[in-house]
Amino acid sequence: MSHIFDASVLAPHIPSNLPDNFKVRPLAKDDFSKGYVDLLSQLTSVGNLDQEAFEKRFEAMRTSVPNYHIVVIEDSNSQKVVASASLVVEMKFIHGAGSRGRVEDVVVDTEMRRQKLGAVLLKTLVSLGKSLGVYKISLECVPELLPFYSQFGFQDDCNFMTQRF
């Protein structure tokens, strides 16, 4: 199975108290067939992304810098990806040529919410980020989710602006 990053890097950061039917692992190339894109569409517009385009983007992300650490939770009962979040690590010249982490695309399937899968993903990514030596991890969220993310050490830190095209 082709993963987006080395699974052994992730293993020490996965909480041990997961139910047996949930497996935390890096995104795999065959997750297209396990509903990964459908899961992302619960978060935002995915656009026209067929399997060929997914696999092409997967390979580009797998081999590029910054490093994309996309983590999924698979339900072994249904063989579906039911939750996902990404830690993007970008290199900087500031902070002694340090690296910054950004948590992105946090999503839990609507039918699997309230099972603390989002918490599992965030704890995993924060632990992974620390081990990778990032000097900070940031994320953007809607105001309603500030209390949720603050449970994991995130603080409302500054204004965020965007341009969409």
Curated annotation (Swiss-Prot):
<feature type="domain" description="N-acetyltransferase">
    <location>
        <begin position="22"/>
        <end position="165"/>
    </location>
</feature>
<keyword id="KW-0012">Acyltransferase</keyword>
<keyword id="KW-0808">Transferase</keyword>
<dbReference type="InterPro" id="IPR039143">
    <property type="entry name" value="GNPNAT1-like"/>
</dbReference>
<dbReference type="Pfam" id="PF00583">
    <property type="entry name" value="Acetyltransf_1"/>
</dbReference>
<protein>
    <recommendedName>
        <fullName>Glucosamine 6-phosphate N-acetyltransferase</fullName>
        <ecNumber>2.3.1.4</ecNumber>
    </recommendedName>
</protein>
<dbReference type="GO" id="GO:0004343">
    <property type="term" value="F:glucosamine 6-phosphate N-acetyltransferase activity"/>
</dbReference>
<feature type="binding site">
    <location>
        <position position="44"/>
    </location>
    <ligand>
        <name>substrate</name>
    </ligand>
</feature>
<feature type="binding site">
    <location>
        <begin position="104"/>
        <end position="106"/>
    </location>
    <ligand>
        <name>substrate</name>
    </ligand>
</feature>
<feature type="binding site">
    <location>
        <begin position="135"/>
        <end position="136"/>
    </location>
    <ligand>
        <name>substrate</name>
    </ligand>
</feature>
<dbReference type="InterPro" id="IPR016181">
    <property type="entry name" value="Acyl_CoA_acyltransferase"/>
</dbReference>
<comment type="similarity">
    <text>Belongs to the acetyltransferase family. GNA1 subfamily.</text>
</comment>
<comment type="pathway">
    <text>Nucleotide-sugar biosynthesis; UDP-N-acetyl-alpha-D-glucosamine biosynthesis; N-acetyl-alpha-D-glucosamine 1-phosphate from alpha-D-glucosamine 6-phosphate (route I): step 1/2.</text>
</comment>
<feature type="binding site">
    <location>
        <begin position="92"/>
        <end position="95"/>
    </location>
    <ligand>
        <name>substrate</name>
    </ligand>
</feature>
<dbReference type="GO" id="GO:0006048">
    <property type="term" value="P:UDP-N-acetylglucosamine biosynthetic process"/>
</dbReference>
<feature type="binding site">
    <location>
        <begin position="114"/>
        <end position="119"/>
    </location>
    <ligand>
        <name>acetyl-CoA</name>
    </ligand>
</feature>
<dbReference type="InterPro" id="IPR000182">
    <property type="entry name" value="GNAT_dom"/>
</dbReference>
<feature type="binding site">
    <location>
        <position position="164"/>
    </location>
    <ligand>
        <name>substrate</name>
    </ligand>
</feature>
